[in-house]
Amino acid sequence: MFENLFSLKGKVALITGGSRGIGRAIALAFAEAGADQVVSSRNKRPPELEKVVEEIKARGKKALSVPAHVGKKEDVQGLVQKTLQTFGRIDILVNNAGANPVLSSMIDLEEDSFEKVLEVNLKGAFLLSKAVAREMIKQGGGGRIINMSSVSGLRARADGTGAYCISKAAMNMMTQVMARELAPHNILVNAIAPGSIKTEFSRVNWTDPERKASRLREIELKRFGEPEEVVGLALLLASGAGSFVTGEIIRVDGGMTI
């Protein structure tokens, strides 16, 4: 009865920020669960992106890489169209692309730096969710949108990551608004809020001795998480196991925000 609960067989997933870290881990897990995929990242990492495509294919699934800047409307349109041209549908969207925090207090933060963070972390997720949701409605049968947020969007920090915190807090509200709007179409929208995960994206948090010590004091499990430890929740939200879950912001943080 429950053996196929986490199966993604016959599904097509679109994953941004898929070249490394959490995005790559989710892509490989989705492949093992049965999903064909389009993985995307910005143009500066095509070799890493192609490697992920080969890893997906090695697991017996179809895959396509599409470099794109999700903050650019024309790139988003191209990404969605290439996915549809290749696979004919989109069942799952994972908005994982993100801009690194700009380390600055709010009063010293430059306007262009603030806009850069919001362009990718918020605007990008908005543009892609909007475009993909429209296709899901046309397709019928529902769909899943998973936004990769952060515990930084759940509480204010005074460590120079203010713009990042703001972008993720806004993403959380967007998640819940879209969950309500899209519920009549059985499109489920949720967010995952990782804590301190050991990725290149957050390298400064686990390589700088002072920041590392500060983070470890906050984490009840007293260690950084690994990208693979986010995968289980992503599978739940993408599969039949999460069919009655929508509008949630779910933390994966080792007890950081208890």
What feature does the model see in each segment?
Residues S104-M106, E110-L118, R215:
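Substrate-binding pocket helix/loop in short-chain dehydrogenase/reductase
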Residues S129, S167, T175:
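Active-site helix of classical SDR
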